[in-house]
């Protein structure tokens, strides 16, 4: 996959701290939300047939401002191995610091969990490897104190956690391009889950962001 694959997606760190609190809920365990931010083509594909997503990276002043504003948000990032390795090759570099300084600082600073059965260590700053069952570990993470959880890329994880009903919110960017073929974001999901559209925003580059919650 190209290094630019998730530059657009990783720029929008829109998950913010949203923990429950207050004296009236002191005995209730904190709950962290799990969100997804990803891009799809106009014909509904998450990647093309070669697993490339560089088509999702479209420069535009309005879009860039949106990315920079949201890059200061707090989240714990969640990845699959392929997405993690690609991110880890780019965001700690001088090129990332020069071209997208705010996003690079956020990506390097935030806590990161990568789910993998093959990785033994994760060298990117503030990263850890989780080899436990995906759904079990996500349930555990959501029950612990900390920033909300945000998945970037990682289509297989998104599909599995959607099937398990563990994702609370989806931010999906529809990019005005037709790929013709590829892989969908929800590959293999069964049961026809439905979602509620809670917000939309259109940008001058043609991107439309939809905020969805599970019905």
Please name every model-derived segment:
Residues 5-14, 27-166, 176-215:
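Portal/gating segments that form or line small-molecule/metal binding sites
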Residues 17-23:
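C-terminal segment of classical bacterial N-terminal signal peptides
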């Amino acid at each position: 996959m190209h290094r630019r694959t998730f530059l657009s997606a990783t720029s929008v760190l829109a998950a913010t701290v949203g923990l429950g609190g207050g004296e009236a809920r002191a005995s209730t365990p904190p709950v962290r939300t799990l969100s997804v931010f990803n891009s799809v083509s106009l014909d509904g594909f998450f990647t093309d047939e070669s697993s490339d997503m560089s088509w999702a990276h479209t420069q535009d002043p309005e879009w860039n401002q949106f990315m920079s504003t949201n890059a200061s948000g707090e989240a714990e990032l969640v990845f699959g191995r392929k997405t993690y390795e690609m991110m880890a090759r780019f965001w700690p570099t001088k090129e990332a610091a020069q071209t997208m300084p705010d996003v690079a600082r956020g990506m390097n600073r935030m806590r990161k969990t990568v789910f993998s059965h093959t990785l033994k260590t994760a060298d990117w700053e503030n990263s850890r490897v989780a080899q436990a069952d995906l759904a079990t570990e996500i349930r555990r993470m959501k029950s612990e104190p900390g920033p909300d959880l945000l998945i970037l890329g990682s289509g297989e994880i998104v599909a599995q956690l959607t099937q398990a009903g563990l994702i609370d919110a989806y931010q999906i960017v529809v990019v005005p391009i037709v790929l013709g073929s590829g892989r969908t974001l929800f590959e293999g999901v069964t049961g026809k889950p439905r979602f509620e559209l809670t917000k939309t925003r259109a940008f001058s580059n043609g991107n439309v962001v939809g905020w969805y919650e599970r019905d």
